[in-house]
Amino acid sequence: LKLDFVPFWVSFHLGLWVTTLLLVICFPLAWVFSQAKGRWVPWVESTASLPLVLSPTVLGFYLLLLLSPRGRIGQFFLSVFHVRLAFSFPGIVIAGCIASLPFMLTALRTGILALPPHLLEASYTLGKGKVETIFRIVIPNMKSGIIAGIVNTFAHTLGEFGVVLMVGGSIPGVTKVVSIAVYEKVESLDFGGAHLYAAILVVVSYLGVLLLNRLQRQERRR
């Protein structure tokens, strides 16, 4: 069986971009959500969790409308940065970020809420500001939450299908990820090829979960 490694590279590249961007975007959001107590918090949290319950096809359809040259976001990127989002790698990165946002946000928020309150209180009592407290107290003591967010987000992005297909199509070397390669193999009745792609994806995902559990156990022992 001939194995094309390009879809794996596209998937890995996509997972790396999505995970990195979401780590940067979601940490301040998780911090605000964990500290805020306003009536708006449940509404914003529910909105951020929508990708968990929405069908990937439905989510992908609306994202395609937004990211197309006639959509507001797509039109903005095209006119300002001269970047076409629909059926392009930058487009599936944005779509992947939205689809995987709940995985990173939930893990980071849980990690922040699990911190003993006295740690933050002691830091503020010693005259430390919020930024210094975050970098010296919060982040070093919530490594388990950060690791969970990274692994869950990366694994989910690797297996993403509906959103990527709707927004990016299946352009070899650009938007054709492993899950789409599996679908195309099945569609062409090449079950041997589909098994090969799927098996590798299962192994990679399993190793990711195994790594997550091991790192979390090590963190708890400390």
Enumerate the language-model features and the residues they cover:
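C-terminal transmembrane helix and the adjacent membrane-cytosol boundary/short C-terminal tail
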Residues: 40, 109-120, 124-125, 137, ...
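Alpha-helical transmembrane segments of multi-pass membrane proteins
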Residues: 9-17, 51, 131, 135-144, ...
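Membrane-helix interface segments
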Residues: 36-44, 72-73, 88, 130-131, ...
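Membrane-interfacial helix termini and adjacent extracytoplasmic/periplasmic loops
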Residues: 60-97, 167-171
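Transmembrane alpha-helix signature in integral membrane proteins
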Residues: 4-33, 52
